[in-house]
A protein has these predicted regions:
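Glycine-rich phosphate-binding loops of nucleotide-dependent enzymes
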Residues: 2-261
């Protein structure tokens, strides 16, 4: 990993609990994320990892607790409001527009950045045309960065799974997030695809300066690229620290590392 400088806390999760009826998905979870770091969340299936991301990006409203991003505390924000604050997310199950091209899928991530009205956008004249050209320039940069130039006009549904994952990452990057939430970005990939995605994640963190919160089942990946790791089990936090510290935590070994998850 590069000699990057980790900044101050920009995302602070405090005492988050989440209930679905009588089922408690998360219980009193607290952790923070520092600027420019890669912060991983691990745990067995059903540990509450995706539920935690859903609370951060406004899909779920926590039953208790609060989340503070750059000094602003929120507990009742929808996904769009969270995105406008500068938090973007990819999902474990791809939600791409399969019939649309790669470039149009990534362009859809620019929606929050569009300032001209719909009428001017449709006419593509004056400021609207210049704005669209600027957005397309940003998107082309992302396409080059992710090494998918050859597929710019290809419908996403025709691409191999690993390339679709890159497009999903590209769409999130098009939002220019300060914090990027990645929900199992390497799920279903072969070794070569995982190595490529690891490289892209590290480069996003290093070159774009984007803070990353990562859920990933591949423990080798987590330990190699993370600055700090928080561990969940049955909706509770059982470990938190640097990778080596977590690797040697007895509770973590029993709950996760010592199992076949």
């Amino acid at each position: 990993m590069s000699n990057k400088v980790i900044g101050d806390v920009i995302l602070d999760v405090k005492n988050i609990s989440l209930r679905f009826g009588g089922v408690k998905a998360l219980t009193d979870i607290s952790f923070n994320v520092k600027e420019h770091e890669i912060r991983s969340i691990i745990g067995p299936n059903g540990a509450g990892k995706s539920s935690m991301l859903n609370c951060i990006n406004g899909v779920y409203t926590p039953s208790e607790g609060s989340i503070t991003f750059r000094g602003k505390t929120f507990d009742h924000m929808n996904s769009r409001q969270v995105a406008e604050m500068g938090i973007a997310r990819t999902f474990q199950n791809l939600a791409l527009f399969k019939g649309m091209s790669v470039i149009d899928n990534i362009m859809s991530g620019r929606n929050l950045k569009i300032k001209s009205n719909l009428f001017l956008q449709a006419l593509r004249v004056g400021p609207a045309q210049r704005e669209e050209e600027a957005h397309r320039e940003k998107v082309e940069h992302i396409i080059d960065f992710l090494e998918i130039q050859a597929f710019r006009k290809t419908p996403v549904g025709q691409l191999p799974y690993g390339l679709q994952k890159r497009v999903d990452l590209g769409r999130a990057l098009a939002m220019e997030p300060q914090v990027l939430l990645l929900d199992e970005p390497m799920a279903g990939m072969n070794l070569e695809e995982k190595q490529d995605m690891c490289r892209f994640i590290l480069d996003v963190n290093d070159e774009f300066g984007t803070t990353i919160v990562l859920i990933e089942h591949d423990m080798g990946v987590v330990m190699d690229i993370s600055d700090r790791v928080v561990v969940l089990d049955y909706g509770k936090k059982i470990g938190d620290g640097e990778p080596e510290e977590v690797r040697n935590n007895e509770d973590v070994i029993r709950a996760y590392l010592g199992t076949s998850h």
